[in-house]
């Protein structure tokens, strides 16, 4: 559990994150970046994070889903947990696909899943890998 591991989590806006990585590089701090591929893994991850992916800085790793169809966290959560998400968010008043609901209501959807299914939800593999690396 992260809360007992000494690992801190910082949500960083896309415009600022490279400054944090530069500081981590200079200090030698172990840092993991977990990010969306935004429908283009090659450009948004491999190209944008080339120095970190090529292991030029072994204390910094970048993790993202490599499948462009799994372009954001909510899409990954839905695809890895369809039965749970459909059960939780499908109501008689639902007028849009469940995944679209989750994309439009990110915080509420995440909170609802955490509250009702924290022990059964499947965490996307790239996030599992990132946590395993940072905790090693």
Label for each model-derived stretch:
Residues 1-136:
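Acidic, divalent-metal-binding catalytic cores of TOPRIM
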């Amino acid at each position: 559990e992260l809360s007992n591991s000494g690992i801190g989590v910082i949500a960083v806006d896309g415009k600022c994150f490279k400054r944090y990585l530069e500081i981590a590089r200079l200090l030698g701090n172990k840092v993991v970046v977990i990010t969306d591929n935004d429908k283009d893994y090659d450009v948004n991850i491999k190209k944008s994070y080339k120095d970190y992916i090529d292991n030029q800085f072994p204390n910094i790793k970048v993790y993202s889903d490599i499948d462009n169809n799994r372009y954001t966290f909510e899409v990954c959560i839905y695809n890895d947990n369809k039965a749970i998400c459909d059960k939780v968010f499908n109501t008689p008043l639902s007028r849009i696909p469940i995944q679209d609901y989750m994309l439009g209501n990110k915080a509420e959807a995440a909170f609802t899943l955490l509250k009702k299914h924290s022990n059964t939800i499947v965490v996307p593999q790239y996030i599992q890998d990132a946590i395993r690396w940072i905790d090693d």
